[in-house]
From Swiss-Prot:
A GO biological-process term: peptide catabolic process
NCBIfam families: peptidase-T (TIGR01882), PRK05469.1 (NF003976), PRK13381.1 (NF009920)
Gene (name only): pepT
Taxonomic lineage: Bacteria, Bacillati, Bacillota, Bacilli, Bacillales
Species annotation: Staphylococcus aureus (strain NCTC 8325 / PS 47)
Protein name: Peptidase T
Primary localization: cytoplasm
């Protein structure tokens, strides 16, 4: 199976599907259609009925081969790649039998070094796909697409493997937070699903952050600095004051595990107007609400010193901790846990310090945990995929549909 995985991942990663947060269309970029149309064709060649809508959501079905009713399971992956780094002219490189030493990426000065990326030490002996140092790889999430496609191929080649109805979904714009926005849960018609969008071997994730964005707008009064006393209000300094009143220890670079944070993503302005953009994250719903409350309290504290209330705050929720919807349905986690145990894969159920499409889909009526893909260092030139771990991910997909047929 390794050769098929390499071939398919190479073909998919060389198609530029970078999404664009500034776009207002869905998909956000026309080039995502290139991979969507290819996948539609390949699924049809496998004999699967497909449904590609005007928003770039590609669904397909592998029909049940058993006579009893069992839950319909879905497998999801996203076609877009991150806008954080160059995604054009991707030239995948193959490292056979990785020796654990630093590896120079193409003709660049970039080096994939285990001292910097210690998770590479667990991949000694693996076949790796890496970049040439000039682009990201796009294994996030094309590795997930590959794993789903190869699992479907295997199931069709082995009809003796019993399974219920399987739904497949390939979606746009996950990297810019819009993946589920036009996802039709009723049309997808699955009882539950799994995103193949994790990273390291053994990840089984069903807890995510609660997430919100806060935009703080500070309005100043700009007068000539030579006559500014008691007249000027510097919006930049208001923004600095606002940020200084947030806990200095509760930022991404000083937190881990279940610890939440405030993250100042952007700060720009002039004396007359300054804007701060934060993301707010916490696994605990009560703490999440308290974080949002703290933002409003800081606004009020600053505004109390002015007559015209110069600081405005706009807070919008982005997604919530999917554990709230998944934990009441323990079988959705028990199924992959049994499969992991059967395959001798140690399950890592640490919470996601982020979100997936499943974070939103779970609150839309489709409970959706996340499973490893075998890739790492997403969104940049040091991205890699372990073909060996990808093969295990394919086995997990096959094991899940077998388990559902046997135990439900």
């Amino acid at each position: 199976m390794k050769n098929q995985l390499i071939d398919r991942l190479t073909r998919y990663t060389t198609i530029d599907t970078q999404s664009d947060p500034k776009s207002t269309t869905t998909p956000s970029t026309e080039k995502q259609w290139d991979l969507l149309h290819l996948l539609e064709k390949e699924l049809q060649q496998l004999g699967l009925p497909t449904d590609l809508d005007e928003n770039g959501y590609l669904f397909a079905t592998l029909e049940s081969n058993i006579d009893v009713d069992v839950p319909t399971v879905g497998f999801l992956a996203h076609v877009d790649t991150s806008p954080d780094f160059n995604a054009s002219n991707v030239k995948p490189q193959i490292i056979e039998n990785y020796d654990g030493k630093p590896y120079k990426l193409g003709n660049t000065k970039r080096v994939l070094d285990p001292k910097v990326f210690p998770e590479l030490n667990s991949l000694v002996g693996h076949t790796l796909m890496v970049t040439d140092g000039t682009s990201l790889l796009g294994a996030d999430d094309k590795a997930g697409i590959v794993e789903i496609m190869e699992a479907i191929c295997y199931l069709q080649e082995h009809p003796e493997i019993k399974h219920g109805t399987i739904r497949i979904g390939f979606t746009p714009d996950e990297e810019i937070g819009r993946g589920p926005h036009k996802f039709d849960v009723d049309r997808f018609n699955a009882d539950f699903a799994y995103t193949m969008d994790g990273s390291q071997y053994g990840e089984l994730q069903y807890e995510s952050f609660n997430a919100a964005e806060a935009v703080i707008t500070c309005h100043g009064v700009n007068v000539h600095p030579g006559s500014a006393k008691n007249a000027m209000v510097n919006a930049i300094r208001l923004g600095e004051q606002f940020d200084s009143l947030l806990p200095d220890s509760e930022v991404p670079e000083r937190t881990e595990g279940y610890e939440g944070f405030y993250h100042l993503m952007n700060f720009e302005g002039t004396v007359e107007k300054a804007t701060l953009q934060y993301i707010i994250r916490d696994h605990d719903k009560k703490q999440f609400e308290l974080r949002k409350k703290r933002i409003l309290e800081i606004r009020d504290d600053i505004n109390a010193h002015f007559e015209n209330y110069p600081v405005k705050v706009d807070i919008s929720d982005q997604y919530f901790n999917m554990a709230e919807k998944i934990l009441p349905l323990p079988h959705i986690i028990d199924i992959p846990k049994r499969v992991f145990a059967k395959l001798d894969i140690p399950a890592n159920t640490e919470p996601i310090r982020g979100g997936t499409d499943g974070s939103q889909l779970s609150f839309m009526g489709l409970p959706t945990p996340n499973i490893f893909t075998g890739c790492g260092n997403f969104h940049g030139p040091y991205e890699y995929a372990s073909i060996d771990v990808m093969e295990k991910a394919v086995q997990v997909i096959i094991g899940i549909v077998e388990d559902i047929a046997e135990n439900h």
